[in-house]
Amino acid sequence: MGRSKLQIIGPNGEIYQPTLKIQRNNDPNKDAEVLYEAMKGWGTNEDRIIGILGYRSSHQRIIIRDQFKALYGKDLITELSSETSGHFKKLLKMLLTDTDKMNARALYKAMKGGGTDESTIIEVLCTSSNCEIEDIKTAYQSVLKDYGISDPRRTLESDVEDDLSGPFKNLVIALLQAKREEIPFEIAEQIQSKGIKSVVDMNLVEQDVETLWDAGEARLGTDEAAIIKILVSRSVWHIQAIAQHFEKKYGKSLIDSLASETSGDFESALLLTLNTCLNRPKAYADLLLKAMKGLGTDDCTLMRIIVSRCELDLGSICQEFERSQGSSLEEWIRSETSGDYRKLLLALIGAEWS
């Protein structure tokens, strides 16, 4: 699983904060033994399971899973699945699966069979960085094998081609190329002191601002291709500058402009792509709110975001969530979930649960 340091730095140079309280000097043998004892005999000690898996990095968890098999000849996911149930079981399985494979499996399920879960495709791919997309594409091949699909022509991109249509498909295919411009982390760190103009070509920014206006507001109909080209290829810093200059020049935010010129899944995907570039933690905070607001909770999305972001930027996401809602993510989780499932989610966001 490759991870770029650029994922933890914002367009203005701020460093995003995680929530996972990782125990750095863990002994994977001891952790495996504790998990085995927690499931041994009659009943299961869920708190001991949470005490281990709620405080280990994704890398540590995979090592623990391997060590469990080496010590006991059993698969840890299989054992936990037989001892737990419901959302708690699903969350444990997510924690013991490589993050990229977890996302790849979600995409496969979103497109298999009759009907398509467009919201999952949008949530996973429109928020992902170049390296995350490349890792998901690789993991998707492993997921296909897990489901008994050996056709070498089947890829994530080919499934998207078959399942989606129109400008929404074009946007997703463009994102899958993972060609967004990036700058070295060391230069990105200096943006807070030197300003965004130090890392972007302002002449190109002005050209892009005019192109986006001409592709939407200034014409009858919308030139989706021109919009897609800019939003999926320019760096997050460049897009930040575009948004600032667009509003200054035309008196309307880029988000509002694109929302007025697009619709449906294409609009949702385009706006999430843009919002992720402008403020990644805010984009995820909005997704978490959407997952919990209203009747019922979208637990799969809630779990997937918390598992995938707790080591990267979930602390910053929590700050944005509370800023926009006036109440904390912890409060919402306590209200919307229950039992051991709630305890494990709270552990992952760095809150007290015992």
From Swiss-Prot:
Function: Involved in reproduction of the worm. Involved in host-parasite interaction. Delivered into the host cell by means of parasite exosomes. Binds to acidic phospholipid membranes in a calcium-dependent manner in vitro. Causes aggregation of liposomes in the presence of calcium, but not in its absence. Likely to promote membrane fusion. May provide structural integrity within the tegument.
Pfam family, one: Annexin
Gene3D superfamilies: Annexin
Localisation: Tegument; Secreted, Extracellular exosome; Host cell
Predominant location category: other
One GO-annotated biological process of the protein: female gamete generation
Domain of life, per lineage: Eukaryota
PANTHER family (UniProt xref): ANNEXIN, ANNEXIN B11
Name of the molecule in the record: Annexin A13
Family recorded in the similarity comment: Belongs to the annexin family.
Binding of Ca(2+) 6, residues: G296, E336
Gene Ontology CC: cytoplasm; extracellular exosome; host cell; membrane; nucleus; plasma membrane; vesicle membrane
Binding site for Ca(2+) 5: M292, G294, L295, E336
Signal peptide coordinates: none
UniProt note: domains: A pair of annexin repeats may form one binding site for calcium and phospholipid.
